Every structure is written in structure tokens, then in C-alpha cells.
Amino acid sequence: MADTGLLTELAAEADAFVHSVGLLLDRESGLGGVNFITSGSRSVPAEGATYDTVMRDSAAALAAAAQSGATGGAERPLVYVSAAEAAWCESEGGQKLEAALPEFLGRYLSAKREAEALLQASSGLRVVLARPSLMYDWSKLDVLPLLPIVNPASALGERYGGGLGLLSKMLRVHVVGAAVVAALEAPEARGAKPICPHLPASPSISLHLTTSPCISRGARRALARRA
């Protein structure tokens, strides 16, 4: 999203916005060269591409473009596809689990949270923060082996609680996509409120919304300056 002029031009013609740009392995992780294995688009991050530039700064650019095209009428919706694990910082168990992650995954979640906070502070937009966990389809062989492990563990967590309750079920990409569309079309979808559209032949999905209360003080100050 480096071409802000083009982005602003396209935003002026849009009724709604979805930000789903992301990467699991950035350049600073030292694993960027194998990001194509986890990427749905088989992408390899460019030199200098970090979680902050790809997931946070691009969200800021989209919000700015959307705001510049506002006509003073109804707020246009913007859905940001975040991550369920961004909520880990809101519980003691989640904080412990996050502390055990590799450093680069901690930076991944921090970038998601900072993007969420930045978007929530944007005026003139109805911001929805969609928080699915791992997504899959039958063509992505890298993530499919996790399916028979994660989903049963998540189901046990829902029933009995404990640490397994922090695991969110893996969802098929089209289920998340349909839920995002439903959030765009639901004028009441905003802020700290779950949206649970029931999709035909699909499990229900909760898109948990938050104001990202657990980003660092330094990040809060930086975001305030941006706003």
C-alpha cells in the first residue's frame, strides 16, 4: 500500500473496506524466505518488510485513504482481519502462553494489536476487528496436519476450561470470508461486541471485537500521534 495516491483514488469509489493483508514470517524473523509455505498467496516478503509495515502501517494507510474520501454521510465499514491470539494478553493464562512464544510471534501479535488500536481511534469509519485463528482450506498442506489436533483441543477447552480454552478452532477460509461480509452488512457491528453469523453448512463463527487494551504505553503514544 505504498502508492497512497492510488489507494485514495480507489477508496473514494468504495462502499466498504476489508484489510486482510498479513504475513506470518517477516524479514526480521530470519524466516521470511520460507513464508511462501504458510502464505495463501505463496508470497515472500520484500526486503525490509516487517509485521509493523505490512500489518500495522498498511492498515493506517487504508484508514487514512478511507477517511479522505468520506462525504460526511453514513460511516463506511472497515473490517480488519486480526488474530484470535491478539486477545491472549487479556488473561493471565494467555500472557503466560504468549511469553513462551518465539520472539517473532510476539512481534506479530503486537503489530496486530497496534493496528486494532489505531483503527479503533479512526473517525468516520465503522471499524470491525475480526479475530479468527488459524485458517485452512484443503489445498494448504502446511496447516492441515494441525486440524485434528487443534480443533479437538479447542472443543475440550470450551467444555472443561483450563489452558485449552485459549485455543480457538481452525476455520475454513470461506467461513471467515462469509463472516467478514456479514460484519460489513450489519450496521450494529462495531466496538466490543461479538458477531455470530450462522452460515449454511458451516459452524458459527464469533468475530470478537476489542479496543486492544494491552498494547504498550509507548505504542499508545505513537498511535496517538498518528491519530
Regions found by a protein language model. Name each.
Residues 1-72:
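NAD(P)H-binding glycine-rich loop region in Rossmannoid oxidoreductase-like domains
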Residues 22-23, 82-85:
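Short, small-residue-rich loop/turn micro-motifs
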Residues 76, 85-199, 217-220, 224-227:
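Oxidoreductase cofactor-interface core, primarily capturing Rossmann-like NAD(P)-dependent enzymes
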Residues 202-206, 212, 216:
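Intrinsic disorder
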